[in-house]
């Protein structure tokens, strides 16, 4: 069984904790210019043909605009087996929820690039799909050399990366579900007020 949630293509390369949301919001927000005009600053690097960075004018994009329904769950570490965790993430994806969490990205880059780097690099991860037959999660991010990549991470490696710190006592997962039929509206009076107050 396989489930892959939509991603706007090309993906907007940005800081994972929040801006990966740009990969999953309604395409209308982009085609209308609303997101680019209001929130994103992009930097294109010609040497590798990538849109490498996105940032916010307003940091509260996700919470303030009502674009997403957000969920949060913490699993007690002692009861959080690979099977339980991976099944729960698959269930989130089945219900249309994208998964965000913290992992030890050193484990991921060691797996992807056959390296043996030591240490912990705590970083956000973004999961948008799975394949139970292959036992992999689909993810994307800056994994190596500042290049944005899509990757398939085996359940076993994924669990190892998420369970890197038993001292925390739990493994936390954040889910984002796009609100259906969200209407992107410009608040023209508010925009005019902002411009006239700066003059």
Q: What positions do the PLM features span?
A:
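Conserved active-site-adjacent core of cysteine acyl-enzyme catalytic domains
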Residues: 2-181
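Non-catalytic accessory segments flanking enzymatic or RNA/DNA-binding domains
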Residues: 183-191
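Conserved small/polar residues in nucleotide/adenosyl-binding loops
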Residues: 195-199
């Amino acid at each position: 069984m396989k489930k892959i949630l939509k991603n706007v293509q090309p993906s907007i390369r940005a800081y994972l904790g929040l801006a990966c949301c740009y990969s999953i919001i309604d395409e209308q927000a982009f085609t209308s210019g609303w997101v680019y005009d209001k929130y994103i600053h992009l930097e294109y690097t010609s040497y590798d043909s990538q849109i490498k960075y996105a940032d916010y004018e307003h940091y509260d994009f996700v919470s303030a605009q009502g674009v997403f329904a957000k969920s949060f769950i913490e699993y007690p570490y002692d009861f959080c087996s690979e099977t339980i965790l991976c099944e729960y993430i698959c269930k989130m994806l089945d219900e249309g929820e994208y998964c965000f969490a913290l992992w030890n990205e050193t484990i991921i880059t060691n797996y992807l690039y056959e390296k043996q780097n030591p240490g912990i690099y705590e970083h956000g991860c973004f999961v948008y799909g799975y394949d139970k037959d292959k036992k992999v999660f689909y993810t994307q991010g800056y994994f190596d050399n500042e290049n944005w990549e899509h990757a398939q991470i085996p359940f076993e490696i994924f669990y190892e990366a998420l369970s890197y710190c038993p001292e925390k006592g739990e493994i936390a997962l954040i889910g984002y579900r796009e609100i259906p039929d969200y209407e992107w509206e410009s608040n023209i009076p508010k925009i005019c007020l902002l411009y006239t107050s700066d003059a």
